[in-house]
Protein backbone atom coordinates (compact mmCIF):
# COMPACT_ATOMS: atom_id res chain seq x y z
CA UNK A 1 0.00 0.00 0.00
CA UNK A 2 1.26 3.48 -0.90
CA UNK A 3 0.49 6.40 1.41
CA UNK A 4 -1.36 9.45 0.09
CA UNK A 5 -0.61 13.12 0.89
CA UNK A 6 -2.52 14.70 3.78
CA UNK A 7 -4.13 18.16 3.78
CA UNK A 8 -0.71 19.84 4.09
CA UNK A 9 0.70 17.94 1.13
CA UNK A 10 2.87 15.72 3.34
CA UNK A 11 2.78 12.03 2.49
CA UNK A 12 1.77 10.30 5.71
CA UNK A 13 2.62 6.62 6.23
CA UNK A 14 1.06 6.52 9.71
CA UNK A 15 -1.54 3.80 10.26
CA UNK A 16 -4.26 5.32 12.48
CA UNK A 17 -5.28 1.91 13.79
CA UNK A 18 -1.72 1.12 14.85
CA UNK A 19 -1.38 4.50 16.56
CA UNK A 20 -4.60 3.86 18.50
CA UNK A 21 -3.16 0.61 19.89
CA UNK A 22 -0.19 2.43 21.39
CA UNK A 23 -2.28 5.41 22.53
CA UNK A 24 -4.26 2.97 24.67
CA UNK A 25 -1.09 1.70 26.37
CA UNK A 26 0.73 5.04 26.76
CA UNK A 27 0.56 5.22 30.56
CA UNK A 28 2.36 1.89 30.90
CA UNK A 29 5.62 2.73 29.14
CA UNK A 30 7.72 2.77 32.31
CA UNK A 31 5.92 -0.06 34.13
CA UNK A 32 8.51 -2.85 34.13
CA UNK A 33 5.78 -5.45 34.66
CA UNK A 34 3.22 -3.84 32.34
CA UNK A 35 2.37 -4.24 28.68
CA UNK A 36 5.83 -3.09 27.61
CA UNK A 37 7.66 -5.64 29.75
CA UNK A 38 8.95 -7.47 26.62
CA UNK A 39 10.49 -4.24 25.35
CA UNK A 40 12.13 -3.54 28.71
CA UNK A 41 13.60 -7.05 28.59
CA UNK A 42 14.90 -6.50 25.04
CA UNK A 43 16.11 -2.94 25.62
CA UNK A 44 19.62 -3.69 26.98
CA UNK A 45 20.33 -5.82 23.90
CA UNK A 46 18.96 -3.14 21.57
CA UNK A 47 21.13 -0.54 23.30
CA UNK A 48 24.21 -2.74 23.03
CA UNK A 49 23.78 -3.01 19.27
CA UNK A 50 22.89 0.66 18.78
CA UNK A 51 25.78 2.03 20.83
CA UNK A 52 28.31 -0.26 19.14
CA UNK A 53 27.11 0.79 15.69
CA UNK A 54 27.17 4.50 16.52
CA UNK A 55 30.61 4.24 18.13
CA UNK A 56 32.01 2.41 15.11
CA UNK A 57 30.46 4.76 12.55
CA UNK A 58 31.51 7.99 14.27
CA UNK A 59 34.75 6.86 15.92
CA UNK A 60 33.54 7.25 19.50
CA UNK A 61 35.00 5.63 22.63
CA UNK A 62 32.14 4.23 24.70
CA UNK A 63 34.33 4.33 27.82
CA UNK A 64 34.70 8.10 27.56
CA UNK A 65 32.51 10.59 29.38
CA UNK A 66 29.58 11.61 27.16
CA UNK A 67 30.84 9.60 24.16
CA UNK A 68 27.99 10.76 21.92
CA UNK A 69 28.45 14.47 22.63
CA UNK A 70 27.90 16.53 19.49
CA UNK A 71 25.73 13.91 17.80
CA UNK A 72 22.17 14.83 16.83
CA UNK A 73 20.01 11.71 17.26
CA UNK A 74 16.37 11.15 16.30
CA UNK A 75 14.38 8.36 17.93
CA UNK A 76 11.39 7.99 15.62
CA UNK A 77 8.49 6.15 17.23
CA UNK A 78 10.05 6.99 20.59
CA UNK A 79 7.17 5.80 22.76
CA UNK A 80 7.90 6.63 26.39
CA UNK A 81 11.60 7.25 25.79
CA UNK A 82 13.17 3.84 26.44
CA UNK A 83 15.91 4.54 23.88
CA UNK A 84 15.92 8.34 23.89
CA UNK A 85 16.90 8.53 27.56
CA UNK A 86 20.01 6.31 27.29
CA UNK A 87 21.12 8.26 24.21
CA UNK A 88 20.80 11.51 26.16
CA UNK A 89 22.78 10.04 29.06
CA UNK A 90 25.57 9.26 26.59
CA UNK A 91 25.74 12.95 25.73
CA UNK A 92 23.74 13.09 22.49
CA UNK A 93 21.36 15.88 21.53
CA UNK A 94 18.16 13.83 21.26
CA UNK A 95 14.82 14.39 19.58
CA UNK A 96 12.08 11.85 20.27
CA UNK A 97 9.13 11.81 17.87
CA UNK A 98 5.95 9.76 17.97
CA UNK A 99 2.67 9.73 16.05
CA UNK A 100 0.83 8.65 19.21
CA UNK A 101 0.15 11.93 21.01
CA UNK A 102 -0.40 10.38 24.45
CA UNK A 103 3.14 8.98 24.46
CA UNK A 104 4.71 12.44 24.48
CA UNK A 105 3.69 13.74 27.95
CA UNK A 106 4.60 10.35 29.45
CA UNK A 107 8.06 10.63 27.91
CA UNK A 108 8.42 14.29 28.91
CA UNK A 109 7.52 13.67 32.54
CA UNK A 110 9.87 10.70 32.88
CA UNK A 111 12.76 12.61 31.27
CA UNK A 112 12.20 15.54 33.62
CA UNK A 113 12.13 13.20 36.62
CA UNK A 114 15.40 11.71 35.37
CA UNK A 115 17.05 15.11 34.94
CA UNK A 116 17.36 14.74 31.17
CA UNK A 117 16.75 17.31 28.44
CA UNK A 118 15.09 15.61 25.46
CA UNK A 119 13.08 17.32 22.75
CA UNK A 120 9.91 15.21 22.51
CA UNK A 121 7.44 15.95 19.72
CA UNK A 122 4.09 14.67 18.50
CA UNK A 123 4.95 14.42 14.81
CA UNK A 124 5.90 12.03 12.01
CA UNK A 125 9.02 11.19 10.05
CA UNK A 126 7.45 12.61 6.91
CA UNK A 127 6.56 15.95 8.51
CA UNK A 128 10.06 16.35 9.94
CA UNK A 129 11.67 15.45 6.61
CA UNK A 130 9.45 17.96 4.79
CA UNK A 131 10.59 20.60 7.31
CA UNK A 132 14.19 19.93 6.26
CA UNK A 133 15.43 18.53 9.57
CA UNK A 134 18.45 16.22 9.50
CA UNK A 135 20.27 14.09 12.05
CA UNK A 136 23.50 12.16 12.45
CA UNK A 137 21.59 9.09 13.61
CA UNK A 138 18.01 7.92 13.11
CA UNK A 139 16.78 5.17 15.43
CA UNK A 140 13.92 3.36 13.76
CA UNK A 141 13.15 0.54 16.18
CA UNK A 142 10.07 -1.69 15.92
CA UNK A 143 8.22 0.88 13.80
CA UNK A 144 8.39 -0.22 10.17
CA UNK A 145 6.00 -3.14 10.78
CA UNK A 146 3.33 -0.67 11.94
CA UNK A 147 3.20 1.72 8.95
CA UNK A 148 1.03 1.57 5.83
CA UNK A 149 3.86 2.22 3.36
CA UNK A 150 7.26 0.86 4.49
CA UNK A 151 9.15 2.24 1.48
CA UNK A 152 7.64 5.70 1.90
CA UNK A 153 8.46 5.64 5.60
CA UNK A 154 12.05 4.48 5.06
CA UNK A 155 12.50 7.13 2.38
CA UNK A 156 11.45 9.76 4.92
CA UNK A 157 14.01 8.33 7.35
CA UNK A 158 16.67 8.57 4.64
CA UNK A 159 15.79 12.22 4.08
CA UNK A 160 16.16 12.81 7.82
CA UNK A 161 19.79 11.66 7.76
CA UNK A 162 22.73 13.93 7.12
CA UNK A 163 25.19 12.66 4.50
CA UNK A 164 27.32 10.09 6.29
CA UNK A 165 24.52 9.48 8.78
CA UNK A 166 23.49 6.15 10.31
CA UNK A 167 20.06 4.51 10.56
CA UNK A 168 19.45 1.60 12.91
CA UNK A 169 16.23 -0.25 12.10
CA UNK A 170 14.76 -3.28 13.84
CA UNK A 171 11.62 -5.25 13.11
CA UNK A 172 10.15 -8.77 12.96
CA UNK A 173 10.75 -11.44 10.34
CA UNK A 174 7.77 -13.00 8.55
CA UNK A 175 7.74 -16.79 8.72
CA UNK A 176 5.93 -19.56 10.64
CA UNK A 177 8.32 -19.28 13.61
CA UNK A 178 7.71 -15.54 14.02
CA UNK A 179 3.95 -16.14 13.91
CA UNK A 180 4.30 -18.79 16.60
CA UNK A 181 6.62 -16.72 18.81
CA UNK A 182 5.48 -13.12 18.30
CA UNK A 183 1.74 -13.63 17.80
CA UNK A 184 0.71 -16.91 19.45
CA UNK A 185 3.39 -16.94 22.15
CA UNK A 186 3.75 -13.26 23.09
CA UNK A 187 0.12 -12.18 22.64
CA UNK A 188 -1.98 -15.28 23.33
CA UNK A 189 0.03 -17.64 25.58
CA UNK A 190 2.38 -15.44 27.63
CA UNK A 191 0.08 -12.41 27.26
CA UNK A 192 3.11 -10.13 27.23
CA UNK A 193 1.29 -7.92 24.72
CA UNK A 194 -2.40 -7.20 24.09
CA UNK A 195 -3.92 -9.35 21.38
CA UNK A 196 -3.71 -7.61 18.04
CA UNK A 197 -0.59 -5.57 18.87
CA UNK A 198 1.09 -6.97 15.77
CA UNK A 199 -0.19 -8.01 12.36
CA UNK A 200 1.90 -10.91 11.05
CA UNK A 201 1.20 -9.92 7.44
CA UNK A 202 3.08 -6.64 8.08
CA UNK A 203 6.24 -8.39 9.24
CA UNK A 204 9.18 -8.00 6.84
CA UNK A 205 11.90 -10.51 5.99
CA UNK A 206 15.54 -9.37 6.27
CA UNK A 207 16.02 -9.57 2.51
CA UNK A 208 12.84 -7.55 1.92
CA UNK A 209 13.99 -4.91 4.40
CA UNK A 210 17.45 -4.66 2.84
CA UNK A 211 15.82 -4.21 -0.57
CA UNK A 212 13.51 -1.48 0.78
CA UNK A 213 16.42 0.27 2.48
CA UNK A 214 18.35 0.32 -0.79
CA UNK A 215 15.32 1.61 -2.66
CA UNK A 216 15.04 4.37 -0.05
CA UNK A 217 18.57 5.51 -0.87
CA UNK A 218 20.61 4.00 1.96
CA UNK A 219 23.39 1.40 1.98
CA UNK A 220 22.81 -1.53 4.38
CA UNK A 221 26.03 -2.41 6.20
CA UNK A 222 25.01 -4.88 8.90
CA UNK A 223 22.22 -7.08 10.21
CA UNK A 224 21.93 -9.27 13.28
CA UNK A 225 19.30 -11.26 15.11
CA UNK A 226 17.85 -10.56 18.55
CA UNK A 227 17.38 -13.98 20.14
CA UNK A 228 15.49 -14.80 23.34
CA UNK A 229 16.89 -17.52 25.62
CA UNK A 230 13.94 -18.99 27.59
CA UNK A 231 16.27 -20.83 29.98
CA UNK A 232 18.19 -17.72 31.02
CA UNK A 233 15.19 -15.43 30.36
CA UNK A 234 17.47 -13.01 28.55
CA UNK A 235 18.01 -11.59 25.06
CA UNK A 236 21.22 -11.74 23.06
CA UNK A 237 22.62 -10.79 19.67
CA UNK A 238 23.07 -13.50 17.04
CA UNK A 239 25.16 -13.36 13.87
CA UNK A 240 22.92 -15.89 12.13
CA UNK A 241 19.53 -16.32 13.79
CA UNK A 242 17.24 -13.63 12.40
CA UNK A 243 14.20 -15.88 12.38
CA UNK A 244 12.06 -13.65 14.64
CA UNK A 245 13.52 -10.32 15.82
CA UNK A 246 16.35 -8.70 13.90
CA UNK A 247 18.13 -5.38 13.50
CA UNK A 248 19.93 -3.62 10.65
CA UNK A 249 22.37 -0.76 10.26
CA UNK A 250 22.49 1.42 7.14
CA UNK A 251 24.40 4.51 6.11
CA UNK A 252 23.74 7.48 3.85
CA UNK A 253 26.54 8.14 1.41
CA UNK A 254 28.39 11.44 1.69
Swiss-Prot record:
Pathway: Cofactor biosynthesis; ubiquinone biosynthesis
Reaction equation(s) it catalyzes: a 3-demethylubiquinol + S-adenosyl-L-methionine = a ubiquinol + S-adenosyl-L-homocysteine + H(+); a 3-(all-trans-polyprenyl)benzene-1,2-diol + S-adenosyl-L-methionine = a 2-methoxy-6-(all-trans-polyprenyl)phenol + S-adenosyl-L-homocysteine + H(+)
Listed EC numbers: 2.1.1.222, 2.1.1.64
Any one GO BP annotation for this protein: methylation
KW S-adenosyl-L-methionine (keyword) present: yes
Enzyme class: transferase
Chain residues that bind S-adenosyl-L-methionine: 46, 77, 98, 141
Protein family (similarity comment): Belongs to the methyltransferase superfamily. UbiG/COQ3 family.
HAMAP family: UbiG
Protein name per its UniProtKB record: Ubiquinone biosynthesis O-methyltransferase
Gene giving rise to this polypeptide: ubiG
Amino acid sequence: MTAAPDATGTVNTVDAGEVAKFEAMAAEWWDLEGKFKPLHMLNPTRLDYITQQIAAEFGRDLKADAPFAGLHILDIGCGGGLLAEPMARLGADVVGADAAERNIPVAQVHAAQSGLEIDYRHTTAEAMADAGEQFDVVLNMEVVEHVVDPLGYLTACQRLLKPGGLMVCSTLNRNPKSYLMAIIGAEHVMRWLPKGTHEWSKFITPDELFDLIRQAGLDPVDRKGFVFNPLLWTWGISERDMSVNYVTASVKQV
